[in-house]
A protein has these predicted regions:
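Basic/polar N-terminal segments that are highly enriched at the extreme N-terminus
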Residues: 1-5, 299-302
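Short secondary-structure transition/capping segments
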Residues: 56-59, 116-121, 146-148, 201, ...
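A general structural signal for well-ordered alpha-helical segments in protein cores
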Residues: 29, 65, 90, 122, ...
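Short helix-capping segments at alpha-helix termini
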Residues: 70-76, 100-101, 129-131, 154-158, ...
Length: 302
């Protein structure tokens, strides 16, 4: 089944776009998948927290997977987010990923469960999906200890990747790397890429940020791989003011201003995170520091 032997690098997380009637905007979902491909990112993940998986119905989520796979057409690995409200729903999504041909699957345990259920979930995912599995280890979703992850990797050979996002991220990445760094292919960090250089020093070789400026994070990663850590850090310092502004409204706005999304509609009110003129002006100022490092799709300030 595997089209890609080793997943690493920057895997852009797709925000879910919506129409005026709050249905998934399939053309925009395809457009953001194309953006990841065309801007040089190393992989695609949908839907996880950035894609607001908790707002998506089962059927529309599977239609979205089909749309992303169709648009990508094998150019990048596509990781399907299988997190759900129950173990049975997680397994439904894992089976669907098997049928659709997703390159990998990722999941967190359902909310308000515990580590025992999380461990059982990953074992049962391996029963219904024969590709590589990613453990997503996050604070609010029955997180596993490093020792539990090590035992799980031993028990489930198809667990080849870990996304470690217990906070503080770099410290926990180091813990997991010390225990399973020679047993899994890649440890991914998260946190929007805010701590990327430190995560890389501690054992990560991948990052899963929201995709709206992940082309710049990709450039940072690739510079790091050449061995020029100071140049990578210099670009990261210039990007940091922008990613510190990241919210769901900001992601959608940036994708709209980069010509990817046709609107900024979400399924929940933006509330206090709604962007006003001052917010948009600050985003535009932050883009000035990295505008020469974008891989196409220039940002158009209002």
């Amino acid at each position: 089944m595997a089209r890609f032997n080793h997943l690493k690098g920057v895997f852009g997380l797709l925000p879910t776009p919506y129409q005026a009637d709050y249905e998934i905007h399939i053309p925009d979902l395809k457009a953001v998948a194309e953006f990841c491909c065309s801007s040089g990112q190393h992989g695609i993940v949908w839907p996880v927290m950035v894609g607001e998986f908790y707002f998506l119905g089962e059927e529309e989520r599977l239609r979205g997977l089909d749309a992303v796979l169709e648009q990508v057409n094998g150019r990048l690995p596509v990781v399907f987010g299988c997190s759900g409200v129950s173990l049975s729903q997680v397994l439904l999504f894992a089976r669907a990923a098997q049928t659709a041909g997703a390159d990998s699957i990722i999941a967190m345990a359902p909310a308000r469960t515990n580590a025992a259920l999380a461990i059982e979930m990953y074992k049962r995912m391996a029963d219904v999906y024969d590709g590589p599995i990613m453990v997503q280890n996050a604070d609010a979703y029955a997180p596993l200890t490093g020792e539990q992850i090590a035992q799980l990797v031993e028990d489930v050979p198809s667990i080849e990747y870990i996304k470690e996002e217990r906070q503080p991220g770099p410290k926990h990445i180091a813990e997991v790397y010390d225990l399973v760094g020679d047993k899994v292919k890649t440890i991914f960090g998260g946190a929007a890429g805010k701590f990327l250089p430190d995560e890389l020093l501690r054992g990560a070789d991948g990052c899963m940020p929201a995709c709206e400026v992940a082309d710049v994070l990709t450039k940072i990663m690739e510079i790091w791989w050449t061995g020029d850590q100071e140049a990578a850090r210099e670009l990261h310092r210039r990007l940091l003011p922008l990613i510190l502004l990241e919210t769901h409204p900001m992601m959608r706005y940036v994708l709209q201003q980069r010509g990817v999304f046709s609107n900024t509609i979400g399924r929940t009110p933006d509330g206090a995170q709604a962007l006003n003129a001052g917010d948009k002006a600050e985003i535009a100022r932050a883009f000035k520091y990295i505008e020469g490092d974008l891989n196409g799709y220039p940002f158009k300030a209002e």
